[in-house]
UniProtKB/Swiss-Prot annotation:
Keyword ATP-binding among record annotations: yes
Designated gene of the protein: queC
Annotated protein name in UniProt: 7-cyano-7-deazaguanine synthase
Residues annotated for ATP binding in this entry: L13, S14, G15, G16, L17, D18, S19, A20, T21, A22, T23
Keyword line: ATP-binding, Ligase, Metal-binding, Nucleotide-binding, Queuosine biosynthesis, Zinc
Organism: Prochlorococcus marinus (strain SARG / CCMP1375 / SS120)
Organism lineage string: Bacteria, Bacillati, Cyanobacteriota, Cyanophyceae, Synechococcales
A GO biological process held by the record: queuosine biosynthetic process
Residues annotated as binding Zn(2+): C194, C202, C205, C208
Amino acid sequence: MSLEERPKTIALLSGGLDSATATAIAIEQGHNVIGLSFDYGQRHKRELEAAKLLANHLKLIEHHIIDINLSTWGGSSLTDLNESIPKTGVLPGVIPNTYVPGRNTVFIAIGLSLAEARNAKQLVLGINAMDYSGYPDCRPDYLDEFQKLANLASKAGREGNGIKLLAPLIHWNKIQIVQEALRLDIPIDLTWSCYNGDTEECGLCDSCRIRNEALQSVRSLNNSKTH
């Protein structure tokens, strides 16, 4: 199959490890991937630089960064500098203040618009088990219901060619994601997961902690296999 004949996929590429891995999976499956990132007023804009580097490394056929400033009304520690980033870990049954109201709903809607305009058949997201333990818009039932909406709300869907919402990591934990990223030769050092907006990762926020613990666990597993 020539490059032009490959099916197109839109990938929501934040610049983090999860979205990079989901994007690489789509590429491995033979898709021409268009990356879609968002400048939504997040304090950690450093992730957008990571998204650019990853888009170049993965040789995406297009990469769009959309400006949609959700910090105008805040409601999250990621978009409101007056709120503190939590460092206490993910508490069962509690939605953390890093949840951004409506973020994924907005992102997926824009992704579906781009997919339909580009005649792409899939929209790939990096949401996973660690995400949906805390965030309502990362859960399997949310994705299932949004798929129904996508089929109803688009020309492609009404004509029976609906755009599929895919979350290949949906049931994976962070260790599994790190292992897959390594298998796919993703340069993990190019990715950015920290919630804080500094030039260096803080190592203290929940995102840093979960990522670093997974990296350490995978290193330990790999070391044990070599001895």
